[in-house]
Amino acid sequence: MFTGSIVALVTPMDDKGNVDRASLRKLVDYHVASGTSAIVAVGTTGESATLSHDEHVNVVLQTLELADGRIPVIAGAGANATAEAIALTECFNHCGVVGCLSVTPYYNKPTQEGLYQHFRAIASCTDLPQILYNVPSRTGCDMLPETVARLAQINNIIAIKEATGNLSRVGQIQDLVNDDRFILLSGDDASALDFMCLGGKGVISVTANVAARQMAEMCRLTLAGDVHAARRLNQSLMPLHRDLFIEANPIPVKWATKVLGLIATDTLRLPLTPLSASARPAVERALQHAGVL
């Protein structure tokens, strides 16, 4: 369940900004049918930063209910305050999620020791598997491989989503952790194939929101060693990997998901605003290039 194509799911909203359950059901069904390995509910792509605590928990629980055991659900549970990250994680202790994804604290820029203490405190409040999430381009904080290796010694810290796009991190973390049970997941669609070739086990993917079957197949081929076929498939996805970040995630992917009819609106919570008209043709061309539109 912690391998292959794991979708970082968008959170569908109606015109008033409330969670759209009908669209959420359609999304879950789409990923079940497309072979997605698991769903991350309310991560960065799910607009965790603009949902209240209660909304955050509710979206995860709704996703679980709609999944109904057909696909594993991972709860986004990160926060830049350790106490809030613990409070979120504790909400998911006995609800049925298979694990939690917890991002490095953003804005307050902790030291490496602060990062270690933060994640150790979260892990101590739960028996759920914990996936670390390192995305310095968004958080302003880079968790170094040495810190990852320290955290990997904690029993229920079982994986990292590495979203630096720096492929040398794969080998650095593997060498320092020296434990094949610790799972490395790419957090960067564009380099995910090469990440897996170096020993990663999958990707937590934005692209999978709109090209779920293709991402699942690309991961399957890569992990099976058929890299030539995987690269051929991935070439059709490269414009999506690029243009789904033409504006800040999840702005483009939410518009693309609406264009495909998977959600009813591309409503986002302020300060995020819908995809600008000038950026839409590039995303539309990328969808066409991938063969999904």
From Swiss-Prot:
| UniProt keyword annotations, A-Z | Amino-acid biosynthesis, Cytoplasm, Diaminopimelate biosynthesis, Lyase, Lysine biosynthesis, Schiff base
The UniProt entry's GO CC annotations, sorted and at most eight, read:
cytosol
Q: Which segment of the chain is annotated as a signal peptide?
A: none
Single GO term (MF)? 4-hydroxy-tetrahydrodipicolinate synthase activity
- Annotated EC: 4.3.3.7
Entries under Pfam families matching the protein: DHDPS
Report the record's disulfide bonds. none
Residues annotated as coiled-coil are none
- Binding of pyruvate: at which residues? 45, 204
Q: Where in the cell is it found?
A: Cytoplasm
Which positions are catalytic residues? Answer: 133 (proton donor/acceptor), 161 (schiff-base intermediate with substrate)
Q: In which pathway does it act?
A: Amino-acid biosynthesis; L-lysine biosynthesis via DAP pathway; (S)-tetrahydrodipicolinate from L-aspartate: step 3/4
Q: Which reaction does it catalyse?
A: L-aspartate 4-semialdehyde + pyruvate = (2S,4S)-4-hydroxy-2,3,4,5-tetrahydrodipicolinate + H2O + H(+)
Q: Which SUPFAM superfamilies match?
A: Aldolase
Q: Which GO terms describe its biological process?
A: diaminopimelate biosynthetic process; lysine biosynthetic process via diaminopimelate
The UniProt site entry described as Part of a proton relay during catalysis is assigned to: 44, 107
The UniProt entry, under CDD domains, shows:
DHDPS
Top-rank taxon, per record: Bacteria
The job of this chain, per UniProt, is described as: Catalyzes the condensation of (S)-aspartate-beta-semialdehyde [(S)-ASA] and pyruvate to 4-hydroxy-tetrahydrodipicolinate (HTPA).
Q: Which NCBIfam families match?
A: dapA (TIGR00674)
**Family statement:** Belongs to the DapA family.
Q: Can you state the subunit structure given in the record?
A: Homotetramer; dimer of dimers.
HAMAP family recorded for this chain? DapA
Protein name per its UniProtKB record = 4-hydroxy-tetrahydrodipicolinate synthase
Q: Which organism is it from?
A: Edwardsiella ictaluri (strain 93-146)
**Per UniProt, what is the name of the gene that codes for the protein in this document?**
dapA
